[in-house]
């Protein structure tokens, strides 16, 4: 499923632009934005070894806490079915734009496109900062050194422990708003996509935070004896 995450929305949104024969400026913009999003994510996933058999470090931990049959059910219904369905849902603003091609691309669309690109740039910077830090730490350990910091706390990570997640979610809200602009309504049924995506990232972040707090007592600024007794602070999400 991880391998499909950066590809499926590109296909879905691109198909709506193709169905309009690439004559609709709004759909073309949406397709290009999602293509740029997919290219960034694919590159980042590939350099981490995602296409070479490397596994997200969280999956073994999750499997260890379940019986085999429980994980198989989780894999089928949540990872495969639900997440594939979610990728369809977050792409549906393009369907709204497709159904309302009569409305012209306007200043609001341009503002949202620029906002999406700003968020994409932010996520790219956050990913690169994390990559540079992790690679530097690996080289230092391989040379027999001891890293001064065990996790990143500068750059964008000075303001949030997960700036890449923050920017990622906001991009799909921006795409949703572009769809809204095509119909002239701020609220529509396709809001379910970014809402469910936000909830998915909140759940994923909480799980990641628990693992990090267990591994690094100083993570989050909590003393070791308090781990497990405090809720996650807002810095996990604050931009």
Question: What is each of the regions a protein language model found here?
Answer:
Residues 8-42, 84-129, 134, 138, ...:
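Hydrophobic transmembrane alpha-helices
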Residues 1-11, 54-78, 146-157:
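Juxtamembrane helix-capping/reentrant segments at transmembrane boundaries
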Residues 73-83, 237-238:
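Hydrophobic alpha-helical transmembrane segments
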Residues 25-68:
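A basic- and aromatic-enriched beta-loop-alpha substructure that forms the phosphate/nucleotide-
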Residues 47-51, 77, 200:
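A general boundary/transition motif marking the beginning of the first structured unit of a protein
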């Amino acid at each position: 499923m991880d391998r499909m995450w950066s590809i499926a929305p590109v296909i879905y949104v691109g198909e709506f632009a193709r169905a309009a024969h690439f004559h609709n400026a709004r759909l073309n913009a949406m397709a290009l934005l999602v293509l740029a999003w997919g290219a960034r994510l694919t590159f980042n996933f590939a350099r981490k070894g995602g296409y070479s058999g490397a596994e997200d470090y969280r999956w073994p931990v999750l499997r260890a806490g379940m019986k085999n049959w429980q994980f198989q059910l989780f894999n089928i219904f949540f990872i495969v079915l639900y997440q594939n369905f979610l990728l369809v849902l977050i792409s549906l603003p393009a369907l709204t734009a497709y159904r309302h091609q009569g409305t012209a691309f306007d200043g609001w669309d341009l503002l949202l496109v620029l906002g999406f690109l700003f968020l994409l740039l932010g996520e790219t910077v956050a990913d690169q900062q994390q990559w540079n830090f992790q690679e530097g730490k690996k080289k230092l350990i391989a040379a027999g050194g001891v890293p001064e910091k065990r996790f990143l706390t500068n750059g964008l990570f000075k303001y949030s422990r997960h700036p890449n997640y923050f920017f990622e979610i906001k991009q799909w809200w921006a795409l949703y708003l572009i769809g809204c602009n095509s119909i002239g309504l701020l609220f529509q049924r396709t809001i379910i996509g970014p809402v469910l995506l936000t909830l998915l990232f909140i759940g994923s972040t909480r799980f990641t935070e628990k693992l990090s707090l267990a591994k690094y007592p100083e993570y989050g600024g909590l003393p070791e004896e308090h781990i497990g007794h405090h809720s996650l602070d807002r810095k996990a999400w604050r931009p």
